[in-house]
């Protein structure tokens, strides 16, 4: 499916590709952006699900910790894992680091004298990472779960902020729109 969507031009072009260090993100980045050296952002690693890791809801049915987590609306920390707040803080630190790399790229382009242009970057990350970043930095007012996206899906957005603001973690993600795919490729 990814290959067909890529061939149809449905994924945006990118000057820089940022990825989670986990294998499936690295492999997906290679499919979507072949030949580009991805920039690994450790902070974009998937959430630590603790005792729930690798288990589906059927396997967790009857587990008192799982039921408590469900009853909390997904706000409790994962037992022996990460809290949503800690996960979000980690992801946001990664976005701040990513923004610094993007600023360096833009300065280098400016020095080349080819005329400054806006950097096009792509992030190949986990759904939870997307949700964490858009909830924290998005200007659209959505909550964590409103930014869920399926495998191979995502959002386009515009990142903004002065170098000083970005250095303080004050980034704005605006014009947030889901990627739209042709119906015949699903």
List PLM regions with ranges.
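Active-site-proximal alpha-helix that buttresses catalytic centers in soluble enzyme cores
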Residues: 1-36
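Acidic, low-complexity terminal tails and accessory targeting/binding regions
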Residues: 47-58, 104-119, 132-186
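Active-site catalytic microenvironments for nucleophilic, acid-base chemistry
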Residues: 31, 35, 97, 101, ...
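Short glycine-rich phosphate-binding loop at a beta-alpha junction
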Residues: 14-21, 109, 115, 120-124
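Generic structural signal for well-ordered alpha-helical scaffold segments
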Residues: 6-8, 88, 92-106, 110
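Phosphate-handling substructures
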Residues: 32-92
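GST superfamily/GST-like fold recognition
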Residues: 127-131
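A generic local structural motif
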Residues: 2-8, 25, 63, 108-110, ...
């Amino acid at each position: 499916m990814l290959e067909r969507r890529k061939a149809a031009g449905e994924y945006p072009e990118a000057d820089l590709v940022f990825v989670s260090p986990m294998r499936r993100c690295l492999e997906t980045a290679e499919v979507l952006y072949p030949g580009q050296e991805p920039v690994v952002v450790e902070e974009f690693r998937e959430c630590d699900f603790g005792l729930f890791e690798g288990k589906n809801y059927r396997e967790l049915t009857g587990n008192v910790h799982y039921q408590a987590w469900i009853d909390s609306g997904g706000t409790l920390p994962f037992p022996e894992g990460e809290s949503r707040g800690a996960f979000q803080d980690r992801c946001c630190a990664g976005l701040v680091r990513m923004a610094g790399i993007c600023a360096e790229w833009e300065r280098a382009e400016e020095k080349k004298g080819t005329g400054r242009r806006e950097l096009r970057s792509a992030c190949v990350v986990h759904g939870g990472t997307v949700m964490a970043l858009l909830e924290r930095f998005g200007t659209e007012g959505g909550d964590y779960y409103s930014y869920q996206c399926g495998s191979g899906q995502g959002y386009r957005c515009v990142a903004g902020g002065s170098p000083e603001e970005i250095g303080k973690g004050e980034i704005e993600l605006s014009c947030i729109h889901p990627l739209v795919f042709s119906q015949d490729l699903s």
